[in-house]
Amino acid sequence: MNLERVSNEEKLNLCRKYYLGGFAFLPFLWLVNIFWFFREAFLAPAYTEQSQIKGYVWRSAVGFLFWVIILATWITIFQIYRPRWGALGDYLSFTIPLGTP
């Protein structure tokens, strides 16, 4: 989608939809929001809706960073402690590696 062909109101509406969609456990939408609207929020000449778009982009970045930290923490803990959890670790695993760590 070429954002240059879209009105400023429509840009704001689309940015807001991606921001709200990220709360449905879809942090990828926040990443898309950051990439699509960063230039509009911070590099484009000033216009009325720009401050709101800037807020949505900042909050999307914070939300995405939060999700990355949470997921990285969970993956690290799971990889380290899965064998110690016994049956629960096996139950949570999609594939069970052979052997012992």
Swiss-Prot record:
Ranges per topology, Lumenal: 79-101
Keyword Metal-binding applies: no
Intramembrane segments: 18-36
GO BP annotations, alphabetical order: amyloid precursor protein catabolic process; amyloid precursor protein metabolic process; amyloid-beta formation; membrane protein ectodomain proteolysis; membrane protein intracellular domain proteolysis; Notch receptor processing; Notch signaling pathway; positive regulation of endopeptidase activity
Protein name: Gamma-secretase subunit PEN-2
InterPro entries from the UniProt entry: Gamma_Secretase_Asp_P_PEN2
Purpose: Essential subunit of the gamma-secretase complex, an endoprotease complex that catalyzes the intramembrane cleavage of integral membrane proteins such as Notch receptors and APP (amyloid-beta precursor protein). The gamma-secretase complex plays a role in Notch and Wnt signaling cascades and regulation of downstream processes via its role in processing key regulatory proteins, and by regulating cytosolic CTNNB1 levels. PSENEN modulates both endoproteolysis of presenilin and gamma-secretase activity.
Species: Mus musculus
Quaternary structure note: The functional gamma-secretase complex is composed of at least four polypeptides: a presenilin homodimer (PSEN1 or PSEN2), nicastrin (NCSTN), APH1 (APH1A or APH1B) and PSENEN.
Localization annotation: Endoplasmic reticulum membrane; Golgi apparatus, Golgi stack membrane; Cell membrane; Membrane
Topology feature Cytoplasmic, residues: 1-17, 37-57
GO MF annotation terms: endopeptidase activator activity; enzyme binding
